[in-house]
UniProtKB/Swiss-Prot annotation:
One of its GO terms (cellular component) is DNA-directed RNA polymerase complex. GO terms for molecular function: DNA binding; DNA-directed RNA polymerase activity; ribonucleoside binding. Its EC number is 2.7.7.6. One of its GO terms (biological process) is DNA-templated transcription. The keyword Nucleotidyltransferase applies. The gene is rpoB. This is DNA-directed RNA polymerase subunit beta. Keywords: DNA-directed RNA polymerase, Nucleotidyltransferase, Transcription, Transferase. Belongs to the RNA polymerase beta chain family. It comes from the Bacteria. It catalyses: RNA(n) + a ribonucleoside 5'-triphosphate = RNA(n+1) + diphosphate. The RNAP catalytic core consists of 2 alpha, 1 beta, 1 beta' and 1 omega subunit. When a sigma factor is associated with the core the holoenzyme is formed, which can initiate transcription. Residues 1171-1180, 1191-1241 have a biased composition (Acidic residues). PANTHER family: DNA-DIRECTED RNA POLYMERASE I SUBUNIT 2 (PTHR20856).
Length: 1241
């Protein structure tokens, strides 16, 4: 039944029935742990890979001995970095040793390797003052993948791909004649026997003896025209290096370097783990019948007799005693199974080797060699350490390739299984650490080339490590990654939830991933292995659907990058649910039968029912209790954080729940946050982990509290911890970040206690919207098509008011004609316009500004003409005449207004780092209070979104019997067809809870049910169906039917009408077509498109049509004359020829077509060729205006580039691949700057 639960400082009444076992992990540990691994181990791995760098003679040796991040010499704190546009980073210092083998001389130096960006405690990076997030990438794991297709005759064709982390791919395929081919590194296919010969089995007999008798193998040998190893090597060489003279030596070294050289072929730890898992012999011989006696080679005992079935334990024992070939009987045929000869080292060594830290299988022949030659513990350990790269090779080895071929042969006998590439056991995460490591590796390998060159050029006697190392390529590759990688994204900071979700995002796009165009349905689909790992609900709508996902609430990422989810172990003896929690990857989970978390169990953990609903791979079954092995840990483990915040999610349709999850991330922080009456209980955890709230670093007592600082006296040593609170700062998205203390002086706080509320949080719980009294009722058609009718009270009482802060900057640069100057003295500007400008020429804080007002007065020198001798003389005698300057002040853009809240000034003199050529930089921050207004977008948490259509006076709104007017009216028709019934249940429960004074927690899949809601309504004294008589506010008459009324949690979304409304009379024009630009950012016009033209044609409005296509668009002369005529009140002149028509003719002429324009009498009409002729006709100087337009366009473009954040916050691929390299087809004429082609355009 309903019971109180303490959430931070608030008590919620919870309807959950299940006891939660196990804690939810820290929600941003994906980021923190990964970066931590990179600093501790990842960097070292890269240095180990590259050590040592030798010159071409092999005399000089350069080694990286160790490194440290100098955390004491960080220049600025996180806040200062944001203010100064700098990067939050620490210097990386590496200890380098140079050995000269001839002289035996060793030089050691500490070399500075550039500033390395550091992760903040919130899991973000500050790059050039902007807060960015590195999104984790979902990629195919390295490994061996088998696939099967059925051809038109119905025979099964098997294919395989061997994918390394980096290096050459091997692809196997079978054709309908049963011949197996191989492609090496995407080249043309060869019969697979050629590869086998080249690797060492030269003759037909050797191949058949090694791989066993097989029809497909014989067919392939017949097709193969080589007969010896040498011929096979030459054949492969010809395919891979066409045009070069083939020799056996060069062919051998080619294959060696292609596959067996760790520098060029890297499996990575994951690859080795997946190879050993897939190719291990024990999986393929389990439950098969042995065709020969299997004898342990060490002891000689018979493990399995001929004709006996091999069970799982025996199979593992067979593998671990070093047997790599087993004959099994399939349909009266004998088949030889070959493994890759890796064994579990712990089964072969009796003493403790945990200090060696070997978790993987090891290569048996090397281990056997060590065990045969050494006997005592110490020397065996020493040898294992020395030979670790031979025991666990980083590259593929011959045995691996033989095992893959054998697996391919075995599939046609149903030995082994094919793989599903969309299974999360075959997809892994590359998080920050690994992405950074790969980038650092690229930088180091570029540096290695430079070092080698310098070693040969410089004098070997006086050479030093410092002189050899050039850190540029390393620093550049790191900078490039953070600045422009597709996975380094401008953080979505609209509210704390969007911040948290962005850090937990998983993207299949990006370098080495998929591209939107190529991704099919299968990759985007929900897969059974997503359960508890990736949210099946939260993903963007649109072209990225299913490619961008969110991590589930309880999921963790293991050392190999696979996502794991926790399960409770069921005691195998008495079938009791224990509190042991096991984290499992997707392929481990497939081996077990797992019960649901809401399966009824008694207080001792025993199942109440005899039959239990379980998941087994992709099936949902009902099985007896005896078969259950694990149990889910919590009902919300399968969804992400945002989805887990939707109450009654179980009663919503999936597509609406998807919209609900996505829209919560777009909720704007309001002036007074209010936690939801009906919550799900995860709000507190989400807010504390999102990183927007200050927490106590140590336990202690609050000593001082003010609006912008909290001091806590530590219990441990009596020292003081200071916490600065952020006041009215601008977020990345222009919303307002403001923190308010929630502790009082003298309060005792434990470690990790919340000290203050941030944006959109209320007592430490995420509070994205407001609890609003609403009813499902239509009102005079004002809620047609999802529109919303709201009460004036919401405007008057600032219920949905939010603060938005915009940043504008002006810089004074050096120009060719002299420096720009920031000054109050601006030409042709009256005193009225300068009333709020101080003596420096900068607006004062607190001033109220409207669009067009000056923020920073700035003048730029104009070009001066050459002076005559007389003028120069006069100038010298009477002093400087006023210099020619033009006004380039920073003004408030169209449609913006507000109050100046902050001004920051950066100058060279104060030692601020400014870009070259900039002398002074001024930033102004304008804050706006935006009340809710018609046209704003609002939404509930169930995907029920709408636009405000009318603000009604409070007295006209429908009212309840007790006289309270509704605050919002929603259309009842928005519910049934969309099937998001959760909103109705939320409204009923909200009604009862507000009367009872409760805050409620109804967790997803484990919340209040219908009977609970009825009980609450009854307890609160309302009717059980939650409906009430409503009265019309205008007449006082009751409406005909009773209406569902209650409290719904409603959000105001970031799509505000103030940002979208826009109007233009005249403005900038595109350079080539001379048509008005489009879009609000360019101050563009509304496009009168093809279909609109048809409409006017159909209507017969010829003059209107002609006007729209000429003087209102691209008839250059006509539009100037028309404007003049309107101003002077004259008649509008005849339209001329549109510029786009001239462009069309030019394009046709460019295709070598002679195009002439003729009149009725077949006389050629001369079109004006250039803009200059137009100018002559108008007697104006067009040059200046065009340049100004270009300046303006350039500035707009720069600003857009800086903000490279797409408005639709569902899609975070800031820099899409298309933006990086424009396709030639996509370059339209608009992109060409015709000024580069001289005057004759």
């Amino acid at each position: 039944m309903v019971h109180p639960v303490q959430v931070g400082k608030r008590t919620r009444m919870s309807f959950s029935r299940l006891k939660e076992v196990g804690q939810m992990p820290n929600l941003i540990e994906v980021q923190l742990d990964s970066y931590d691994w990179f600093l501790k181990e990842g960097l070292q791995e890269v240095f180990d890979d590259i050590n040592p760098i030798q010159d071409y003679t092999g005399n000089l040796n350069l080694e990286f001995v160790g490194y440290k991040l100098d955390l004491d010499s960080i220049k600025y704190s996180v806040e200062e970095c944001k203010e100064r546009d700098s990067t939050y980073a620490a210097p990386l210092k590496v200890k380098v040793r140079l050995l000269n083998k001839e002289t035996g001389e060793i030089k050691e130096q500490e070399v500075f390797m550039g500033d390395f960006p550091l992760m903040t405690e919130q899991g973000t990076f500050i790059i050039n003052g902007a807060e960015r997030v590195i999104v984790s990438q979902l990629v195919r794991s390295p490994g061996v993948y088998y696939d099967m297709t059925v051809d038109k005759t119905g025979s099964k064709l098997f294919s395989a791909t061997v994918i390394p982390n980096r290096g050459a791919w091997l692809e196997y395929e079978t054709d309908s004649n049963n011949i197996i081919y191989v492609r090496i590194d995407k080249t043309r296919k060869l019969p697979i026997t050629i590869l086998a010969r080249a690797l060492g089995y030269g003759t037909d007999a050797e191949i058949i003896e090694f791989f066993g008798e097989d029809e497909r193998l014989k067919a392939t040998i017949e097709k193969d025209n080589t007969k010896t190893r040498e011929e096979a090597l030459l054949e492969i060489y010809k395919r891979l290096r066409p045009g070069e003279p083939p020799t056996v030596d060069s062919a051998e070294s080619l294959i060696e370097s292609l596959f067996f050289d760790a520098k060029r072929y890297d499996l990575s730890r994951v690859g080795r783990y997946k190879f050993n898992k897939k190719l291990a012999i024990h999986l393929r011989i389990t439950n098969q019948i042995a065709d020969q006696d299997i004898v342990n080679p060490q002891t000689g005992e018979i493990l399995v007799q001929k004709g006996e079935k091999i069970d799982k334990d025996k199979a593992i024992e067979i593998q671990n005693c070093g047997i790599n070939e087993v004959y099994i009987k399939i349909d009266d045929k004998s088949f030889k199974v070959i493994g890759n000869h890796f064994v579990d080292i712990h089964s072969l060594i009796s003493f403790d080797i945990s200090d060696l830290n070997i978790k993987e299988y090891v290569f048996y022949p090397v281990l056997k060699e060590i065990l045969d030659n050494y006997a005592d513990e110490e020397s065996i350990k020493e040898e294992i350490r020395k030979n670790i790269y031979r025991l666990i090779p980083k590259h593929i080895i011959r045995e691996d390739i033989y095992a893959t071929i054998n697996y391919e042969l075995g599939l046609s006998y149903d030995i082994g299984y094919k793989d599903d590439i969309d299974h999360l056991g075959n997809r892994r995460l590359r998080s920050v650490g690994e992405l950074l490591q790969n980038q650092f590796r690229i930088g180091l390998s570029r540096m290695e080339r430079v070092v080698k060159e310098r070693m040969t050029i410089q004098d070997q006697e006086v050479i030093t490590p410092q002189a050899l190392i050039n850190i540029r390529p390393v620093a550049a590759s790191i900078k490039e990654f953070f600045g422009s990688s597709q996975l380094s994204q401008f953080m979505d900071q609209t509210n704390p939830l969007s911040e948290l979700t962005h850090k937990r995002r998983l993207s299949a796009l990006g370098p080495g991933g998929l591209s939107r165009e190529r991704a099919g349905f299968e990759v985007r689909d929900v897969h059974h292995s997503h359960y508890g790992r990736m949210c099946p609900i939260e993903t963007p709508e649109g072209p990225n659907i299913g490619l961008i996902n969110s991590l589930a609430t309880f999921a963790k990422v293991n050392e190999y990058g696979f996502i794991e989810t926790p399960y409770r172990r069921i005691d195998p003896k008495n079938k009791r649910a224990t509190n042991d929690i096991v984290y499992m990857t997707a392929d481990e989970e497939d081996l077990y039968v797992i019960a649901r978390s809401d399966e009824p169990i008694d207080e001792n953990g025993y199942f109440i029912d005899d039959k239990v609903t379980v998941r087994a791979k992709e099936e949902v079954l009902v099985v007896p209790v005896s078969e259950v092995e694990y149990m889910d840990i919590s009902p919300r483990q399968l969804v992400s954080v945002a989805t887990a915040m939707i109450p009654f999610l179980e009663n919503d349709d999936a597509s609406r729940a998807l919209m609900g999850s996505n829209m919560q991330r777009q909720a704007v922080p309001l002036l007074k946050p209010q936690a939801p009456i009906v919550g799900t209980g995860i709000e507190y955890k989400a807010a504390t982990d999102s990183g927007v709230l200050p927490k106590a670093k140590n336990a202690g007592t609050v000593a001082y509290v003010s609006a912008d600082e909290i001091r806590v006296r530590r219990d441990s040593d009596g020292g003081i911890d200071k916490y600065k609170l952020l006041k009215f700062k601008r977020s990345n998205q222009g919303t307002c970040i403001n923190q308010r203390p929630i502790v009082s002086k003298g309060e005792v706080v434990a470690k990790e206690t919340l000290l203050a509320d941030g944006p959109s949080t209320d007592l430490g719980e995420i509070a994205l919207g407001k609890n609003i009294l609403m009813g499902f009722i239509t009102w005079e058609g004002y809620n047609y098509e999802d529109a919303m009718l709201i009460s004036e009270q919401l405007v008057r009482e600032d219920v949905f008011t939010s603060i938005h802060i915009e940043e504008y900057e002006a810089e004074a640069r050096d120009t060719k004609l002299g420096p720009e100057e920031i000054t109050r003295d601006i030409p042709n500007v009256g005193e009225e316009a300068l009333k709020d400008i101080d003596e420096r020429g900068i607006i004062r804080i607190g001033a109220e500004v409207r669009s067009g007002d000056i923020l920073v007065g700035k003048v730029t020198p104009k070009g001066e003409t050459e002076l005559t001798a007389e003028e120069r003389l006069l100038r010298a005698i009477f002093g400087e005449k006023a210099r020619e300057v033009r006004d380039t002040s920073l003004r408030v853009p169209h449609g913006e207004a507000g109050i100046i809240v902050d001004v920051k000034i950066f100058t060279r003199e104060n030692g601020d780092e400014l870009p070259p050529g900039v002398n002074k930089l001024v930033r102004c921050y304008i804050a706006q209070k935006r009340k809710i207004s018609v046209g704003d977008k609002m939404a509930g948490r169930h995907g029920n979104k709408g636009v405000i259509s009318r603000v009604l006076p409070e007295e006209d709104m429908p009212f309840l019997p007790d006289g309270r007017p509704l605050q919002i009216c929603l259309n009842p028709l928005g519910v049934p067809s969309r099937m998001n019934i959760g909103q109705v249940l939320e409204v009923h429960l909200g009604l009862a809870a507000s009367k009872l004074g409760w805050h409620i927690a109804t967790p997803v899949f484990d919340g209040a049910i219908e009977s609970d809601i009825v009980d609450c309504l009854r307890k609160a004294g309302y009717s059980e169906d939650g409906k009430t008589v409503l009265y019309d506010g205008r007449t006082g008459e009751p409406f005909d039917n009773r209406v569902t009324v209650g409290y719904m949690y409603i959000l105001k979304l970031a799509h505000l009408v103030d940002d979208k409304i826009h109007a233009r009379s005249t403005g900038p024009y595109s350079l080539v077509t001379q048509q008005p630009l489009g879009g609000k950012a360019q101050f563009g016009g509304q496009r009168f498109g093809e279909m609109e033209v048809w409409a006017l044609e159909a209507y017969g409005a010829a003059h209107t049509l002609q006007e729209i296509l000429t003087v209102k668009s691209d008839d250059v002369v006509g539009r100037v004359k028309t404007y003049e005529a309107i101003v002077k009140g004259e008649n509008i002149p005849e339209p001329g020829v549109p510029e786009s028509f001239k462009v069309l003719i030019k394009e046709l002429q460019a295709l070598c077509l002679d195009v002439k324009v003729l009149n009725d009498d077949n006389q050629e009409i001369k079109l004006k060729e250039s803009v200059d002729e137009d100018a002559d006709e108008l007697e104006v100087n067009i040059e200046g205006t065009e340049n100004q337009l270009e300046d303006k366009e350039e500035k707009e473009e720069e600003k857009e580039k800086e903000e490279n954040y797409q408005e639709d916050s569902n899609e975070y691929d800031d820099l899409r691949e298309e933006d990086v390299e424009p396709d030639l087809e996509e370059l339209s004429l608009d992109d060409l700057d015709l000024d580069d082609f001289g005057d004759e355009h």
